[in-house]
Amino acid sequence: MKIKTSLLLLSVLSTSVSASAIHLSPELKIGSYHGFGVQAGITDVASLGAVYLSYSHIWYDSDRYDETVDTYRVGIQNMFGRNPNHGFQAEIGVASYDGTKTRSGEVEEKTTHGLSLGGAYVYQATPMLGLRAGVDMNIFDHNKTFVPYDTTVNFNLGAIISF
């Protein structure tokens, strides 16, 4: 077991040493829930365009509902073709939901965790600047949230900076 762990650690460390740049990508979330997010990682790892960690915070406020969702994901970016201007990002992770419903002075609260998925199209405009547009989906257990169908879907727009 120690040999397998050592080999895995060695391969991860040697891969990250060969990375060529930092991947940083702020984003805006658009939909019934709105908010922001950020990706941070390294480029050119294990034959991929980038490997990164992603965090986002979205919220919904109304007279009756006050809801927030925080997501924590790991993602990869893969560029296509000879001249890699076009690519795709895929992310998977966890989502944390906190919601409050106020009706006739009574307050009801719900908190849960669920699955978070994301995907985006990437256009690499220059070696240092890329643009992306995608969709995020957070899926929670039935009746654990105030969200219809216990699922949130958001569109996102972001810029990718590599340095």
Where are these regions (language model features)?
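Predominantly the C-terminal beta-signal and adjacent terminal strand-loop region
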Residues: Q124-F163
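Residues on the lipid-exposed face of transmembrane beta-strands in outer-membrane beta-barrel proteins
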Residues: L28, V38-D44, V74-N78, I92-V94, ...
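Sequence/structural signature of outer-membrane beta-barrel proteins
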Residues: G31-G35, S56-R64, A95-R103, M137-K144
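Short glycine/proline- and aromatic-enriched beta-strand/turn motifs that initiate or cap beta-hairpins
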Residues: V17-Y65, V69-Y72, G87, G158-S162
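Mid-chain, structured segments of secreted extracytoplasmic proteins
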Residues: D61-R103
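Outer-membrane beta-barrel channels and translocator barrels
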Residues: T43-G49, G81-N85, Q124-M128
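Cleavable N-terminal export/targeting peptides
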Residues: M1-H23
